[in-house]
Each structure stands twice: as structure tokens, then as C-alpha cells.
């Protein structure tokens, strides 16, 4: 067997391991969310299936698998089926350039940040396809809300990272992590971190920025007509998006795998888990604002913060260069 074939098989195996880990983390987060919400609300939560309710996730997956695969009679069948597939795969593909350890990662691209922003933007098409193809007014309104919110906050998501690019001089995520060996970016880039955090919550449509799925207004939004495994793809895709944003926060602002004593993978996993719990805490503690307030907050607060961060970072870099 040639060396090139062995290298190819190793890369495929590495990609499969990362894929299984990402999907497993996203699915397991749904269980952790239910348990933590129950703990904070002084109730039990899922605790009947398996020890401590750990097999509840498997029971839910079996239930979704055997549910009727129903498509509305007036829906556009092809686009209706395509939408959840895009939603599920977009965030998974973005993980290809996230460096987990100094030696572990699927791909090492010099334009890694641009790749993530471009791939994550594909999720907008999934939302639009789902709302339009369902032939349901609530689905359409939810998809319009989601697309407007996502497109707006992706602008702030990208601009909040320009300070890091100016500071490190690279779009490569591995170079950005290596540059944080002495000082994490969250300290000099505190404005960028705050804006990225707000934008990340909005892009993943998580509470309190979950207006596209507001049950009281839109009856669960753009995936109201979905059931079974199609709904499951949307569901797991949302949690994979949370894992992606949490890992990006760790990679870009909190030193990635850097940390004392413990192995790099453990540090990366612990930091990512902390921000995943933070997402759950937001759902448990904050009310949902109106949609116009969410959009106004983005353009009137997040945009000026990102521009100010870019201006200050550029000025500091120029002063240090002289």
C-alpha cells in the first residue's frame, strides 16, 4: 500500500472521528440542556430511561426514526426535503478548519475564518427553503424573520473578527491560536468578544434571539410542518451550531487548546463546554424581546462596537509598528 493511500485513509479516518464527535456533542447537548433547565427550575427532568436518564437521547432518536415521514400535500417536495439536509451539513462543514489540538484538525486553511463565515451562511438558504416550500404562512413568516436576523448578525459576526485579523495578521485559525500562547485575545479584543457573543447567539437563533421560532407568535416558525427525521436534522443542526460558536469563541478569544497541566484536547473541550452551558443559561434566565428590538440592537449597538473595535485595534497596531 502506497504512502499516499495511507495518508488519504488517515485523513478520512480523522474526518470521520471529528464528524462523529461533533454530531455526538450536539445531540448530547440537548440532554444536558434538559437536565440543567430542570435543575435550575427545581424539577427532575428526564431521569427514567437508563441511569440518570442518559438513555433518554437514544429513546428520542428511536421515536423520531419511526415517526411518519409526512410531507404537506401542497409543499414543494424537493426543496422541502433539501432544507433540513442543508441546515444539518452547513455547520458540520464549518468544523473542518477548527483546530482542536496542535496536531488535530481536518484541514488547515490560510483563509479559515472566511471559510467558516461562507459555509455558515449556507444555513440561511435552509431556512428560506423550509419556509417557502412548506406553503404555510407561519413557516414563511418565520423564515423571513430568520433570514433577516441571520444576514444582519452575520455582518457583525464577521466585523467583530476583523480586530483579531488586524492584530495577528492572519485568517488562519491555527496561527490565531498560536498567537495567544502568552495572552488570550479576549483581553485586547474585549469589544470584539462581546459583539461576537451577541452575534453568535443571534445567528444560531437561540434564546433570547429566537424570534424566528417564537411559539406564541409563529407556532414554532419555519419548521412547523416538519416531523420525524427531517425535524430531527433541524433540531440537531441547531445544537451543532451552538457547539460551533462555542468552539470558535474558545479558538478566537480564549486561547484554544492552551492551558497548564492538562492535555490540549481536555482544555479545548472544557472551555467549549463552559460556553455551551452559557448558551443554556441564557435560555433559562432571559426574556424574549420583540423582533424590531433585536434588529435595532444589532444595527445601533453591535455595528458601532465592531467599527470602534476595528478603529482602536488598527490604531494600536500602527503605533506599535512605528
Curated annotation (Swiss-Prot):
PANTHER family: NADH DEHYDROGENASE SUBUNIT 1, NADH-UBIQUINONE OXIDOREDUCTASE CHAIN 1
Reaction(s) catalysed (UniProt annotation): a quinone + NADH + 5 H(+)(in) = a quinol + NAD(+) + 4 H(+)(out)
This protein's record includes keyword Transmembrane: yes
Function: NDH-1 shuttles electrons from NADH, via FMN and iron-sulfur (Fe-S) centers, to quinones in the respiratory chain. The immediate electron acceptor for the enzyme in this species is believed to be ubiquinone. Couples the redox reaction to proton translocation (for every two electrons transferred, four hydrogen ions are translocated across the cytoplasmic membrane), and thus conserves the redox energy in a proton gradient. This subunit may bind ubiquinone.
Species assigned in the record: Aeromonas hydrophila subsp. hydrophila (strain ATCC 7966 / DSM 30187 / BCRC 13018 / CCUG 14551 / JCM 1027 / KCTC 2358 / NCIMB 9240 / NCTC 8049)
GO cellular component terms given for this protein: plasma membrane
EC number: 7.1.1.-
Root EC class: translocase
Subcellular location: Cell inner membrane
UniProt keyword DNA damage, yes or no: no
Annotated NCBIfam families: PRK06076.1-1 (NF004740), PRK06076.1-2 (NF004741)
InterPro entries listed in its UniProt record: NADH_UbQ_OxRdtase_su1/FPO, NADH_UbQ_OxRdtase_su1_CS
Keyword entries, A-Z: Cell inner membrane, Cell membrane, Membrane, NAD, Quinone, Translocase, Transmembrane, Transmembrane helix, Ubiquinone
PROSITE patterns per the UniProt record, alphabetical: COMPLEX1_ND1_1, COMPLEX1_ND1_2
Protein name: NADH-quinone oxidoreductase subunit H
Entry membrane topology: Multi-pass membrane protein
GO molecular function: NADH dehydrogenase activity; oxidoreductase activity, acting on NAD(P)H, quinone or similar compound as acceptor; quinone binding
A biological process from GO: aerobic respiration
Highest rank taxon of the organism: Bacteria
